[in-house]
């Protein structure tokens, strides 16, 4: 094996070095403290699980992104987590089994067999929050507001948000009686805004339903889109109108809370269609070709764990958040250089200093005070009689 092969990392797999690793850890603590202040409880999920458990309730996209291995003890197939959200849903539905609303949050590394987008990391640090047990738009507004508060905490500039609702397309597709194959083809065409394909795929449908499905292609833009949707989808089935009402209610409350936030609506944007069941949302910033935070409602996932529960939430990549954020993350600087000594009084003083939050670095045999600079120390412990004093490091 060539020497280069011993240190070469796979594409999309990164190591994080100081001081960036410290900045990420400080940001992680700040965001989790924010979540806690909103009532969200922290949970930790396993890095690897049996595959059928890991992928329960998830779409095919997650299956393709999951690294798979064979457990040498059981012989069963296992997977490294590619998304923490289904694991947290299982905790709520199967482990906690609470009756009322439950708020959970998490932060941890995930591993992707395939990158989410070109040049994306395959080892992001996924961070997010989930709210279970309430199906009202108020829950969606809460998690979106928390997501935006997180971005404000990180001081990510120039954010704008996309909002949609998969229930609008799903309700129209069911009313049209589309087969699974045609529904998937129409879904793909809508994502590409391929109007000619949409027209062809809806040619044999009742004219009113065909017209409403075709309208989804260009029902995108600012707040006026929702007013236009009320007119163009006026004859839609009740579930479609209910979905539109929910989207309107969410949009109005967000506009009141965040009047400076640009909102963009796309009723043909079906991000996570096979996974989400209601409102879907994503945050974008200029110069980044993919969303930096995203989420939505996924009420069906708990049923796969034996207990259906309404659910809504969001996630982001902590490393991306730190990279894009302009908030000043203050890292501890400086430290105290401790000589290599067996003096008991020195040890007692060092323990006291560390308990007070001071950073104390011990010299190793043969190291001189000059090594203290390399260890980012600006002070040193010097013995005066029986006592040790903290003094500035000599130039």
From Swiss-Prot:
Keyword Cytoplasm among record annotations: yes
Pfam families hit by this protein: tRNA-synt_His
Protein family according to the UniProt entry: Belongs to the class-II aminoacyl-tRNA synthetase family. HisZ subfamily.
A GO CC term assigned to this protein in UniProt: cytoplasm
Function according to Swiss-Prot or TrEMBL: Required for the first step of histidine biosynthesis. May allow the feedback regulation of ATP phosphoribosyltransferase activity by histidine.
SUBUNIT field: Heteromultimer composed of HisG and HisZ subunits.
Signal sequence extent: none
Protein name as annotated: ATP phosphoribosyltransferase regulatory subunit
Positions of disulphide bridges: none
Keyword annotations: Amino-acid biosynthesis, Cytoplasm, Histidine biosynthesis
Pathway(s) of this molecule: Amino-acid biosynthesis; L-histidine biosynthesis; L-histidine from 5-phospho-alpha-D-ribose 1-diphosphate: step 1/9
Example GO BP: L-histidine biosynthetic process
Subcellular localization, as worded in the UniProt entry: Cytoplasm
InterPro entries: aa-tRNA-synth_II/BPL/LPL (IPR045864), HisRS-like_core (IPR041715), HisRS/HisZ (IPR004516), HisZ (IPR004517)
Record's miscellaneous remark: This function is generally fulfilled by the C-terminal part of HisG, which is missing in some bacteria such as this one.
Statement: the UniProt record of this protein carries the keyword Thylakoid: no
CDD domains: HisRS-like_core
């Amino acid at each position: 094996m060539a020497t280069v092969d011993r240190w070469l990392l796979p594409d999309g797999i990164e190591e994080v070095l100081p001081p960036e690793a410290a900045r990420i850890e400080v940001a992680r603590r700040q965001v989790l403290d924010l979540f806690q202040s909103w009532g969200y409880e922290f949970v930790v999920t396993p890095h690897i699980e049996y595959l059928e458990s890991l992928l329960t309730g998830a779409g095919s996209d997650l299956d393709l992104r999951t690294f798979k291995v064979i457990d040498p003890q059981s012989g069963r197939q296992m997977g490294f987590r590619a998304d923490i959200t289904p694991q947290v849903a299982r905790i709520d539905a199967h482990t906690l089994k609470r009756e009322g609303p439950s708020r959970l949050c998490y932060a941890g590394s995930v591993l992707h067999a395939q990158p989410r987008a070109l040049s994306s990391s395959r080892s992001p640090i996924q961070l997010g929050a989930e709210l279970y047990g309430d199906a009202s738009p108020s829950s969606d507004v809460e998690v979106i507001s928390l997501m935006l508060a997180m971005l404000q905490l990180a001081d990510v500039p120039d954010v704008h948000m996309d909002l949609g609702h998969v229930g609008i397309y799903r309700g129209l597709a069911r009313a049209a009686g589309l087969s699974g194959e045609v529904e998937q083809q129409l879904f793909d065409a809508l994502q590409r805004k391929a109007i000619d394909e949409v027209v062809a795929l809806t040619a044999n449908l009742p004219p009113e339903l065909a017209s409403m499905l075709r309208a989804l292609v260009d029902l995108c833009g600012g707040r006026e889109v929702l007013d236009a949707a009320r007119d163009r989808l006026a004859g839609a089935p009740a579930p479609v109108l209910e979905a539109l009402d929910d989207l309107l209610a969410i949009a109005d409350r967000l506009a009141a809370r965040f009047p400076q936030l640009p909102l963009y609506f796309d009723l043909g944007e079906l991000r996570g269609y096979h996974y989400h069941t209601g409102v879907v949302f994503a945050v974008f910033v200029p110069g980044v070709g993919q969303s930096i935070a995203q989420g939505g409602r996924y009420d069906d996932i708990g049923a796969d764990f034996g207990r259906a529960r309404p659910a809504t939430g969001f996630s982001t990549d902590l490393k991306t958040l730190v990279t894009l954020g302009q908030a000043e993350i203050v890292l501890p600087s400086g430290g105290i250089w401790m000589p290599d000594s067996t003096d008991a009084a020195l040890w007692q003083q060092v323990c006291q200093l560390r308990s007070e939050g001071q950073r104390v670095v011990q010299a190793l045999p043969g190291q001189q005070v000059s090594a203290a600079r390399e260890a980012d120390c600006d002070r040193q412990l010097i013995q005066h009689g029986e006592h040790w004093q903290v003094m500035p490091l000599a130039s």
